[in-house]
A protein has these predicted regions:
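Expand to "…catalyze enediolate/carbanion chemistry for C-C bond making/breaking, isomerization
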Residues: 1-214
């Protein structure tokens, strides 16, 4: 706003859940809360992952924003300097988070190798950025000294490989052996393993994925 540009909020990754009304209500409530936060913070617009959510997001902004934008609004009470931007967030590493990164990365890579770029996973629309974030965290947790689970166990290559086998096996059991065998699940798991246990951080996961396309 200080430079006259519109401030656009982040994407709501939720998608409508057509076969579960309760889950759908939860998803819509999360989108509504996210968009209310954005417009009340001064954003001028936003975006969503699914066209079915456009009307909801538009209604929230129409309710709280009088004009076409809020560029005259300044957040004068907030002061951020360069040092603030360099602060590393503190948080916990959990086994559930470790498993989730593995599971989502394998699911996305299998879909991508099979020709899909945007993939619904756990009622969220995911793209390559999801896989990039997941695999980057996995690599960093293994190689960084603070890569320790909240229960005290070090995140190691051995732990990762064991959980990768478990998560891949769970996917095979979920979708069935035949669907697993004809899909891109094994190449996806192999790619995730290769890039995660590598001694150096690969700058771009999808470059390696492209090399595996037929």
């Amino acid at each position: 706003h200080r430079r006259g540009a519109w401030a656009i909020g982040g994407m709501a990754a939720q998608i409508p859940v057509r076969d579960d009304s309760h889950a759908n209500e939860i998803a819509l409530a999360r989108v509504r809360a996210d968009k209310e936060r954005e417009v009340l913070e001064g954003h001028d617009g936003t975006w969503v992952a699914h066209p079915g959510l456009v009307s909801l997001a538009s209604a929230v902004f129409a309710e709280h924003m009088a004009g076409t934008d809020q560029r005259d609004r300044r957040l004068e009470d907030i002061e951020i300097d360069a040092l603030d931007l360099l602060q590393v967030p503190r948080g916990r590493i959990t086994e559930a988070g470790l498993r989730d990164n593995i599971n989502v990365a394998v699911r996305y890579l299998a879909a991508w190798l099979g020709g899909q770029g945007c993939v619904p996973i756990n009622d969220l629309m995911e793209d390559a950025a999801t896989a990039e974030i997941a695999r980057a965290q996995l690599w960093q947790w293994i190689h960084h000294p603070t890569g320790i689970l909240d229960e005290g166990q070090n995140v190691t290559t051995e732990l990762f490989l064991g959980l990768l086998r478990e998560e891949t096996g769970a996917i095979r059991e979920e979708i069935g052996a035949e669907a697993f065998d004809v899909g891109e699940w094994r190449p996806a798991a192999a790619l995730l393993e290769e890039i995660t246990v590598a001694g150096s951080f690969e700058p771009y996961l999808m470059k390696l994925a492209y090399e595996r396309l037929d």
